[in-house]
Regions:
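Charged phosphate-binding loop/patch that engages nucleotide di/tri-phosphates or the phosphate backbone
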Residues: 129, 133-163
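N-terminal strand-loop-strand
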Residues: 1-44, 92
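Non-DNA-binding regulatory cores of transcription-related proteins
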Residues: 120-126
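Short, charged/polar surface micro-motifs in flexible loops or helix N-caps
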Residues: 14-16, 31-34, 50-51, 85-86, ...
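Active-site-adjacent beta-strand/loop module that shapes the phosphate/pyrophosphate-binding cleft
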Residues: 80-117, 129, 151, 155
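Short, charged, solvent-exposed linker or helix-capping segments at domain edges/interfaces
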Residues: 19-20, 101-107, 140-142
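The catalytic Nudix box helix
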Residues: 44-78, 132
């Protein structure tokens, strides 16, 4: 069975911006491996969940662990995408407005350099940032890009026909 993760895509529709200026909050992984990687390295906050755990509950937990923010409000299902690794990621979107300066990530231990036998404690996430939808497509992992399409389509359907 492929690994499973659940995640949340926080979005906002800032007032005073041109209509259609949807923004999404993405995270950049911490640690030396990711330090010089930017475009194509960002992701939605997500993490693995156990067989007996509800995916949405796991997504909320992972979001808080990786950002320090509390996810609340209506959660819009975005379905699942499969990453290149084979991992299945199930995601929801919610409207929020977290300040990237307030991001606080959990930490984890890695072996660094690889196969060195040395351990290094790193933040799981070293940065969070708001992106316009077009810019997000450049920075987000390509195997999660479909989640942006689904969010845009979901919000378009909810807003009804243009007048």
């Amino acid at each position: 069975m492929p690994a499973r993760s659940a995640g949340l895509l926080m979005y906002r529709l800032p007032k005073g911006r041109p209509e259609g200026r949807l923004e999404v909050f993405l995270i950049h992984p911490g640690g030396p491996y990711w330090a010089k990687k930017d475009k194509g390295a960002w992701a939605i906050p997500k993490g693995k969940y156990e067989q007996d755990e509800e995916p949405l509950v796991a997504a909320q937990r992972e979001f808080t662990e990786e950002t320090g923010f509390i996810a609340a409000g209506e959660f819009l299902p975005l379905g699942s995408v499969q990453q290149r690794s084979g991992k299945n990621v199930t995601a929801w979107a919610f409207e929020g407005d977290g300040d990237p300066a307030d991001l606080v990530s959990n930490t984890c231990w890695i072996e660094w350099p690889p196969h060195s036998g040395r351990s290094l404690e790193i933040p799981e996430v070293d940065e969070g940032r708001w992106f316009g939808l077009a810019e997000a497509r450049d920075y987000l992992r390509s195997d999660q890009e479909e989640l942006l399409n689904r969010l845009a389509e979901t919000l378009k359907k909810r807003s009804g026909p243009s007048r």
